């Protein structure tokens, strides 16, 4: 995504997308990939959205970066996606500034913005961490629905084992930036082989209590 500046510069290895190394292509070509080829959902949508522009304006600007489109056409596409995601008041979301929406609604709007160009790959960086449990469940359902509707491959970065169980087909466990375990989600979660993976799973609180009869 190119968001980290010099300190986050990749100095070794490749980032492969559609048979090309993203690190080797010009910035102009990278811009075509971001959004249209690879979408991104950030951990805190409120921080990633511009506070002085409405959601509708930001959607229109995002779409204009990739295709020639009128404001009315952009709105029609956005409203259609809002409806598919079961937004209760699509017009209000379109007209609102981020600070006028709840954290959960901002996150849902961020998901919609990430999917407007129907990218084949969607990165989700801790998309539920800043949300309460009920909104987390809703956001997970919406991402699963997007995968079903559009065939999107979702790469989710999370420490939430519940989200992993709900969404993941394949699971990669990292420790200090290195892979310690990789396999199907069911295998890794139910039969972990690496000590670090086992410790992660043991750290999940167990909702159990003893009942005397």
PLM regions and their residue ranges:
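Catalytic Walker B motif of ABC-type/P-loop ATPase nucleotide-binding domains
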Residues: 122-125
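A short, surface-exposed alpha-helical micro-motif characterized by mixed small hydrophobic
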Residues: 164-166
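A short, proline-enriched helix->beta-strand linker immediately N-terminal to the Walker B motif
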Residues: 116-120
């Amino acid at each position: 995504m190119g968001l980290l500046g010099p300190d986050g510069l990749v100095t070794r290895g490749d980032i492969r997308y559609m048979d090309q190394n993203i690190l080797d292509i010009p910035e102009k070509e990278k811009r075509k990939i971001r959004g249209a080829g690879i979408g991104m959902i950030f951990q805190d949508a409120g921080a990633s959205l511009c506070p002085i522009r409405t959601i509708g304006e930001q959607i229109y600007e995002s779409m204009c970066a990739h295709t020639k489109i009128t404001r009315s056409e952009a709105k029609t596409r956005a409203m259609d996606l809002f409806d598919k995601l079961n937004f209760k008041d699509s017009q209000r979301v379109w007209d609102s500034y981020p600070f006028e929406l709840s954290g959960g609604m901002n996150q849902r709007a961020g998901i919609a913005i990430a999917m407007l160009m129907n990218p084949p790959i969607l990165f989700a960086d801790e998309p539920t961490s800043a949300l309460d449990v009920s909104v987390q469940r809703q956001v997970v359902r919406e991402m699963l629905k997007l995968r079903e509707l559009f065939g999107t491959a979702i790469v989710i970065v999370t420490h939430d084992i519940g989200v992993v169980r709900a969404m993941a087909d394949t699971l990669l466990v990292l420790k200090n930036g290195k892979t310690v375990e990789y396999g199907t989600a069911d295998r890794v979660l139910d039969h972990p082989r690496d000590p670090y993976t086992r410790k992660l799973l043991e750290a999940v609180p167990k909702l159990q209590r003893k009942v005397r009869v």
